[in-house]
Amino acid sequence: MTDTLSDYVDCTPLLDDREALDRFYDEHGYVYLRGALDRELVRTAAEQMLEGLIALGHADPATTLDTLTIDSFEAVDEVAMHDYVKYDDLWNHPSTLKVWEKVLGEPVFVFKSTTIRYYPSAAGSAEPSFLTPLHQDGFYIGPNKDFRTAWIPLLPTSHGIGGVAVADGSHKKGPREHVVTEQFRRFGHAVRGIPAEEFGTDEQLLFSPMEPGDVLIFHAFMCHKSIPNVSANPAGMRMSMDTRIQPASSHRGFNALTPWPESAKDASKGILSKITGTPTTAE
């Protein structure tokens, strides 16, 4: 693996070809769709996120989505922010469910746990506080591993604004060891990740700029990490949401049935519940 980023492959043309779509997913571990979601629904979620940041005192009342900036992601009361963003209206809208069902090829259940992100630019910082290491969502979420993560931007992203990089085909090796790495800290705590030296040269990192309405869907064992927001001239906000989808017939675990705030506000469940919504002793 190198730090050189290649583009995602746009899988939108495969949506009506079941065999080709499944073949691509099985080989690469992700599906990237351009403009598949209703842009008005995505815009509404972005405006709700802006409303929350203003109401909680982190943005000026006159701020718009085009001019928004905040001082710190971690300074915002994330549990309170969830009261403003009605993400389930987007995830479970009939037009969105149609996309999920086309991707999975069967009826789906959308997790009740959603992660929301609003990262300001950290231009000039070598190690922004909100970096995440290479990791697998399946390390934290279960017990079944047939879920897929769905990640969407609420505002346009770029190489400067960042987003999610996936390691092409890395899901095929199954679960990997996650080790505590002091370099990566969230809310003052070191978090676990997969050492870069564990990856082969064939597991190329992929990242593409995305627009509202685009969606990236990937395997529970897809290795992925954040690309930091280091945008400058102009600096921009990175606003995103992610959830998980799974076959409706599959077992529904803690993360599938528990809204993120209910887990995150329970300090006894540990720092990973604050980050992922999943209680775990692996910290």
Swiss-Prot record:
Annotated Gene Ontology MF terms? Answer: 2-oxoglutarate-dependent dioxygenase activity; iron ion binding; L-ascorbic acid binding
Pfam families the record matches: PhyH
- The EC code for this enzyme is 1.14.11.35
Q: Per its record, how is this protein called by name?
A: 1-deoxypentalenic acid 11-beta-hydroxylase
Gene encoding it?
Answer: penH
Q: In which pathway does it act?
A: Antibiotic biosynthesis; pentalenolactone biosynthesis
Q: Where is this region: Disordered?
A: 260-283
Q: Disulphide bridges in this chain? A: none
Give the lineage.
Bacteria, Bacillati, Actinomycetota, Actinomycetes, Kitasatosporales
